[in-house]
């Protein structure tokens, strides 16, 4: 067992200060026996815990608050259990509030009082509303959990607890961890709102490919184990004494970051009980040069900090553009302006001239999105048509903070114009700055053109958010990727316009050939204009005895990914096609008890409680007041041991706490 109990580090361990913003670090798996670790290095990258203060309810004692998360091959199931006692001499209302990642699906909720458990039931939204209305008419209280739009961000319910009685809340949500910039992120939000006697966060990660102890570009090593565990169990005193804490205790975000080992030319193909999942992220591919057009809104609404942060981000991005890339800059208000009439090579002279142009960008005028995007497409078409070979990836990046107010302003017309102009030849990414933008319009336009929409939050780190997005698409490796399998059905998306360095393609499906002993995958794509092919195979017999493959997880992963992709596809359709997609997504949501935009969860509570309807916030809801942040360092060999983090028999991750950040950012 790895343990360093003889080194009892103080709660406020000294670690290097962070001058600008927190950086993220991999979670390291340790397998004992090991010697006690040394202090953390200044190059470590750090996950973030935000501390949010909230009032403690008088007479209400949250005596146990547990968060347990099991991650199997990137699929995470998280269970939050809160046990509460009413110490008062009269009945009190007890609240249960949980925040979760936006792409997670709630799959279970229950309340237990006086030996009686009240379970949530997932239904169609209309049926859920009817059940709620009936419960209210009978004088009962019914909690209604709904998802608005395509996000799941918060869950709140309450129940009246008699004097000296207890209640147990339990909520389960599920998610597929997405690989971004070479790492997976598991976000856990813990907000018990008071100091808790029994506080514990227990995360268990199982990856059969192994978890590297170092994720640097030039060095990757791993321990023999394919498991890692984070066990965070602070005492009451530690919950009070951490920076920014007090009577309200710990309350905030815990971010765990890791990656897996990868053979250079192979993916990871797994089969279990008639379902399969294929993770594909090759590392033996040369970088493909790209053609990129930046389309920047400089209308009057970008006044002040927004335009300053945009300039700052563009200057940083230009510092990182490789010389073999070609690029163009377009700014627009009611008029479209091009820095150059065509795309140019990213030579030092051209980059310096582009920086001079960016420094002079000023806000003025209205917003003509249609003309700006069409001009960007025209420039790309002229440039790519003149290329002798198709060895590059071509993308457009639109940044805007408002609705179109000049030129063509009908949203459907703009989307149709852009889709026709692009013609599946290029990828369009749409970045919406702030909360006044029509995010649904931007997201739909991006999805129609093989891209994604992304919100840029108007906080102190907005420039870093812009840079971070560009980093995700800065290094294309493969284009026109096709994933092919034999003897399968109900397969998720199998074609992808681009595969970028640091990302991962995930495909899941149903194995229909009962005689199939070995599932084979053939992946085709283009690298620098040349076709490349990869092959993966997995034996049902081998996977059946693999301890890292779970029957439940692969099937639920398939259902989760299918529903997510159907909801994206449904946005782009109309008429009978739209209804068919909605029906399939609804049926899967009901079968697997997922709370999605098409379903709601009803919980009928004890008689006499107040009626209550509970909804999820819409995408784009502005964040609440700023918070102080406390950094938790997740490291491997280089760390000061944190007493509240218990060691495990096979692995552990240690924490130490630094000084809080003071810039007030919500999106660090």
Regions found by a protein language model. Name each.
Residues 108-152, 158-163, 170-295, 459-460, ...:
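An acidic, Ser/Thr-enriched
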Residues 74-78, 87-94, 106-108:
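Exported/extracytosolic protein signature
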Residues 67-77, 84-86, 160-166, 498-500:
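Short, solvent-exposed beta-strand/turn "edge" segments of beta-rich domains on protein surfaces
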Residues 1-68, 138, 395, 405, ...:
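Pro/Ser/Thr/Gly-rich intrinsically disordered low-complexity regions
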Residues 284-345, 370-375, 388-400, 404, ...:
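Von Willebrand factor
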Residues 83-90, 98-100:
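Asparagine-centered strand-capping/turn motif at beta-strand->loop junctions
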Residues 323-327, 367, 391-394, 422-429, ...:
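Loop/turn elements at helix/coil->beta-strand transitions in domains of secreted/extracellular proteins
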Residues 402-448, 452-456, 461-467:
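VWA/integrin I-like adhesion module and closely mimicked acidic/polar interface patches used
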């Amino acid at each position: 067992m790895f343990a360093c109990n003889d080194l009892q580090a103080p709660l406020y361990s000294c670690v290097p200060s962070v001058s600008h913003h927190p950086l993220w670090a991999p979670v390291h798996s340790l397998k004992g026996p090991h010697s006690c670790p040394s202090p953390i290095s200044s190059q470590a990258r750090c996950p973030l815990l935000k501390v949010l203060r909230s009032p403690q309810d008088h007479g209400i004692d949250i005596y146990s608050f547990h968060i347990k998360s099991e991650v199997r091959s990137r699929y995470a199931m998280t269970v939050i259990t809160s046990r509460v006692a009413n110490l008062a001499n009269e009945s009190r209302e007890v609240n249960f509030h949980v925040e979760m990642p936006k792409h997670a699906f709630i799959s279970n909720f229950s309340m237990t009082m006086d030996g009686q458990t009240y379970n949530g039931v997932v239904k169609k939204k209309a049926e859920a509303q009817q059940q709620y209305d009936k419960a209210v008419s009978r004088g009962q209280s019914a909690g209604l959990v709904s998802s608005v739009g395509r996000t799941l961000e918060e869950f709140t319910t309450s129940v009246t607890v008699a004097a000296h009685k207890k209640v147990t809340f339990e909520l389960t949500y599920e998610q597929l961890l997405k690989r971004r910039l070479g790492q997976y992120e598991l976000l856990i939000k813990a907000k018990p709102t008071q100091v808790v006697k029994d506080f514990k966060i227990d995360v268990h990660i199982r990856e059969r490919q192994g978890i590297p102890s170092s994720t640097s570009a030039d060095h990757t090593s791993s321990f023999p184990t394919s498991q890692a565990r984070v066990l965070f169990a602070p005492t009451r005193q530690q919950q009070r004494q951490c920076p920014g804490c007090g009577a309200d205790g710990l309350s905030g975000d815990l971010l765990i970051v890791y990656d897996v080992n990868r053979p250079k030319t192979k993916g990871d193909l797994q089969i279990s009980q008639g379902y399969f999942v294929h993770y594909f992220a090759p590392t033996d591919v040369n970088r493909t040069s790209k053609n990129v057009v930046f389309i920047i809104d400089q209308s009057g609404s970008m006044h002040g900090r927004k335009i300053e942060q945009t300039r700052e981000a563009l200057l940083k991005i230009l510092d990182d553009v490789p010389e073999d890339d070609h690029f163009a800059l377009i700014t627009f208000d009611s008029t479209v302006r091009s820095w150059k009439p065509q795309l140019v090579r990213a030579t030092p002279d051209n980059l310096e001239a582009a920086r001079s142009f960016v420094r002079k960008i000023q806000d003025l005028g209205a917003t003509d999105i249609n003309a700006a995007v069409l001009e960007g497409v025209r420039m790309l078409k002229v440039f790519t048509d003149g290329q002798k070979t198709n060895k590059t990836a071509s993308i457009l990046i639109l940044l805007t903070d408002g609705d179109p107010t000049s030129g063509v302003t009908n949203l459907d017309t703009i989307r149709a114009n852009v889709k026709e102009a692009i013609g599946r030849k290029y990828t369009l990414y749409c970045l919406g700055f702030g909360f006044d933008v029509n995010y649904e319009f931007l997201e739909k336009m991006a999805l129609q053109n093989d891209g994604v929409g992304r919100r840029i939050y108007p906080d102190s780190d907005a420039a870093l958010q812009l840079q971070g997005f560009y980093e995700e698409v800065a290094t294309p490796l493969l284009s026109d990727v096709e994933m092919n399998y034999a003897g399968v059905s109900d397969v998720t998306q199998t074609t992808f316009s681009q595969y970028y360095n640091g990302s991962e393609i995930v495909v899941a499906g149903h194995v229909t050939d009962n005689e199939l002993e070995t599932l084979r995958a053939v992946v085709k794509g283009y690298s620098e204009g040349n076709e490349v092919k990869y092959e993966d195979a997995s034996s049902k017999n081998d996977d059946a005895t693999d301890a890292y493959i779970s029957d439940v997880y692969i099937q639920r992963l398939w259902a989760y990914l299918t529903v997510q992709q159907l909801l994206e596809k449904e946005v782009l359709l109309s008429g009978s096609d739209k209804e068919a997609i909605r029906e399939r997504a609804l049926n899967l949501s009901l079968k697997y008890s997922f709370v999605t935009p098409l379903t709601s969860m009803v919980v009928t509570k004890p008689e006499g409680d107040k009626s209550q309807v509970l909804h999820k916030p819409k995408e784009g809801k502005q964040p609440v007041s700023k918070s102080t942040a406390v950094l938790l360092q997740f490291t491997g060999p280089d760390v000061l041991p944190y007493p509240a983090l218990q060691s495990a028999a096979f692995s552990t991750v240690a924490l130490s706490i630094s000084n809080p950040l003071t810039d007030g950012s919500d999106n660090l």
